[in-house]
Amino acid sequence: MTERAETISSFLTAHGWGAAARTPLAGDASARRYLRLARGDERAILMDSPNPAEDVVPFIAIANILHRLGLSAPEIKAAQPDDGLLLLEDFGDGTFTRLIAQGTDPAELYRLAVDALAVIHRDFRPDQASTINLPRYDADLFIEQVMLLADVYVPAALGRAATAA
């Protein structure tokens, strides 16, 4: 067993999930990986973020802010930030894509998303995030994020590199 696997196993055991079945989930555009844990009828998500550049502390802080605003964010059941480990509430597989494919009205989903954005715009105060080390979202960061579309999304979605055309 690798040192990372031992760290994860110890974390899960300490929080009662050591014997849980583990199913890998699709990741996001980061070095993090996610496992769905199953223990009888209970489910949870393990966020494994071993890369120091993918600090979990901002995730925790943002989840807390969203909760204070009355918005949904996964409950953090356990955290070991120095090791990049979080045990999260499992919201299930109800992504917009899946829900729309199952017949949910897209307009209703987008209305809910816009409502959440309106709450953030109306009620969020920057001093609530003063301890979160997030980069300023300026033109340079915007371009960097847009380039992820070409560098990450296009190859994943189309199976080939993006072209200038």
Language-model region placement:
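Conserved phosphate-coordination/catalytic loops
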Residues: 2, 28, 57
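ATP-binding pocket architecture of kinase catalytic cores
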Residues: 35-144, 148, 154-158
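Short, N-terminal intrinsically disordered low-complexity segments that are rich in Pro/Gly
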Residues: 1, 23-24, 48, 52
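Intrinsically disordered, low-complexity segments enriched in polar/charged residues with Gly/Pro
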Residues: 9-13, 21-24, 63-65, 74
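Membrane-targeting and insertion segments and their boundary/processing signals
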Residues: 4-8, 30-33, 120
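Central P-loop NTPase core of STAND/AAA+ ATPases
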Residues: 160-165
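Juxta-kinase regulatory segment immediately upstream of eukaryotic protein kinase catalytic domains
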Residues: 1-17
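ATP-binding glycine-rich phosphate-binding loop
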Residues: 17-35
